[in-house]
């Protein structure tokens, strides 16, 4: 089987249809980083059945579809097609009829992948097994993607065993063994569940047998209860009728008494109405008299209030006049005060203006004295400044020399300290350097941590694989569960529909006999045609039309010879036994022949529904009757219930499988999380070991550099100390050469005293000038205040005159009002006398009206008493009548309740209860209490039976049938498990034989290839960790030229890469794969090793039929290829493929040279 072409369309960056030809020899793929070279490898693996989107560098499987670019829209599908040359007919038998196999995988966005081989849709598993049998596949070591060399180097020995399995060609056996193990596990699970169900069914059979016996006893007790209930209800109905008659007689007597009381009450009401009509006019007259009297009393009270208000007004006027006199006196005094104040302010104004003129003359002389004092002080201060400058210069020089001396002394002291510190630091570094850690031990610790890291990475890969497998198992468990639940739902819906139809047809008082018939399948039309509407009749004795049990009689004629009775195919109540025994089942042809042999009452019927009767009546088959349809539906309902039970069992099993898969996925996820946490810990340990090694190395380098710097500092400090000593001696000599500054300080002190005297004089003169200025300012402010105060007093004087005029006007008004009020008492006395006279007359009228009203109300009260008494008698009569009517209605309701209970409980009319109780007319009946006691006893007997399953016999037959079916299924499962276990053992045996046979061959090729690639040295493969080759790990022991033997992880990067390549090529020589892809495996190699690598590739291409595809950036590797494909990205986000046939170019060049 040879791969010849790979066609991509819409896969990742290859948006346009692209053909990648895979020809014999070496094919190179080159191009810049990020242009899509690795997409070719991923397309090849994807078409071989890769299921992990992570290994394809995608966020999900839809991410392999072209997602669009700046100028290209996204695609909705992607497709990769591989063409395989099958001319040697090495494909599986089902596909071995074609010379060329086109294997395609197409994915629609959000719709999943579809696999096809030569246009026929197949499973992903079929494609994976096809490539696994050919020693290749999506996870084959022959497809060496970026980082694959590193994975082989870092892999655990158990993981490297996969290389041997590919060499032995047992990958397909592993897949088949895994599938068989899954089937074995499922079969064992099903066997356990079947055995559990069989045990449950056995328990149910025992229980149903007991329930069937209870059902028979229950029916007997129920019949007695029904008869006793009928007698009890009959007695209650008879008593209720008698109670209704007695209540009716009492009610008629009450009605007559009510009529008499109604007449008496009507007469009393008439008299009451006549007397009540005279009261309104008397009440109105009394009210008018009382209103007139009240109006006069109110007038008298109003007159008193007006007189009091007049007196209060006179007192108020007197008080206000007195107040106005005080206000006028106060305003007059305020005008006098204003005149005096204005005169005082004029005098003060004149005096202040004279003082201001005197101060102006005095101020001019003081200003001249201030100018003279300032000039004298300025001359003295200038001389003081000159002397101060001279003394400061002298002092500054002295201070400078003294500071220089102090500075040099401090420098000497600091240098001495630094010299001591440098010497101490040199001694300390010598001690620390002698105690520094051994870098070799730290390097070994780094290697140990790296080995642990490699083990943890292997554990993480195993956990990821386990999680992927668990997720695949979970995904595979969902679809069967959905199908099973849909099947259960469909069967439940059909069963409910049929049950509803059957129940809707039997909603009558007596269930028809058809409900008790069970017909063998295929005989529904026959029994429906021959019995027809007779099947709708019940067997209940109380029904007006019913079947009765007369039994098969000995004198009944036998059916014609060779005719089979319908009773043999029908299970029916005994009431139908005689009828069914006289009905024969024949074919249509025989029916026509035998119809003349029928005796009285006999019938023949065909399975299609043709009927022949003894009296010559013949009915041809027609559409199924209602009874036939009903029987068919009941048969179908039974089949559905059986199917539904099995479907529920299957759904439960699949649900448990899904739950188990979910639990396995959770465990796998937890294991992956734990392994990743361990990996992170191992990485932290590696980083810590590397950091410790780097820190120790940095510390050693720092000590060496520090020692060199301290030696330089020691030499520099010695030179600086000598310079500091010389500078100190020079500064001390300069201080000795300076003259003393005593004379300059004395002259400066004399000038300072003269300046202080002149400053005091100038200050006194300035203080005198400032006092004069302040006095002038105060005088100006006082003149302004006098002007404002004069204006205020003038306003007050004008206001007082105005207020006096206003008050005098108000006094005149109040005096006039007081004069008017002086005559008010005489006027009020006259008015009061007139009102009192009118009040006396009004009181006499009111008393007369009140007396007349009281007499009328007394008579009315007596009339009301008589009317109330008659009304009470009428009310009592009505209540008595109502009670009688209520008792009569209650008796009728009780009668109706008894009749309704009879209809509900006995399902007969009340008149038929006696017949149901088998009561003979005129017979003496037992007391009601005795019947109730007997009924209670029967009911207790029925209740002691508890919940009774009336369908126990039918359920018993169904469960026994299920038990037999499951027992047969259990035997089949046991046999299948034996076959599966035998098959798994056979596969394991074959895999071990192949693996051991290929190990020696691979090991021999590996030794030879290792020596070739390294130019010497030794290497070998070892099976470790287990005696079973299927569980053992593969370890690599290598000894490059000039080194001791060591494991793969301790080699250098280039050596590891060459060793891994030797292992991969050894596998090729053992079981050559149709294709080998090497994705930048030459990246860690130097030019010399690249030459060796290319020599080996060339040799492999010649000695095997494997077709090599090499993705590289190395120009040496490019030059050794037979052909090159270039991957470019001229348009952003879109890859294009171009090819160059290097061998053809060389041939053309050779021809031109020749």
Curated annotation (Swiss-Prot):
Q: Coiled-coil regions in this chain?
A: 170-215, 282-505, 627-993
Query: Where are the membrane-spanning stretches?
Result: none
Q: Tell me its family.
A: Belongs to the SMC family.
Name the UniProt key words of this record, in alphabetical order: ATP-binding, Coiled coil, Cytoplasm, DNA-binding, Nucleotide-binding
Give the UniProt record's GO annotations in the biological process aspect: chromosome condensation; chromosome segregation; DNA replication; sister chromatid cohesion
Q: What does this protein do?
A: Required for chromosome condensation and partitioning.
Matches recorded under SUPFAM superfamilies: P-loop containing nucleoside triphosphate hydrolases (SSF52540), Smc hinge domain (SSF75553)
Q: Gene Ontology cellular component?
A: chromosome; cytoplasm
Q: Where does ATP bind?
A: 32-39
Record remark on domains: Contains large globular domains required for ATP hydrolysis at each terminus and a third globular domain forming a flexible hinge near the middle of the molecule. These domains are separated by coiled-coil structures.
Do you know which Pfam families this protein is assigned to? SMC_hinge (PF06470), SMC_N (PF02463)
Q: Where in the cell is it found?
A: Cytoplasm
Q: What is this protein identified as?
A: Chromosome partition protein Smc
Molecular function terms from GO: ATP binding; ATP hydrolysis activity; DNA binding
Report the superkingdom from the record.
Bacteria
Q: How does it assemble?
A: Homodimer.
Question: What InterPro entries does this protein map onto?
Answer: P-loop_NTPase, RecF/RecN/SMC_N, SMC, SMC_hinge, SMC_hinge_sf, SMC_prok
Keyword Cytoplasm among UniProt keywords = yes
* Gene3D superfamilies recorded: P-loop containing nucleotide triphosphate hydrolases
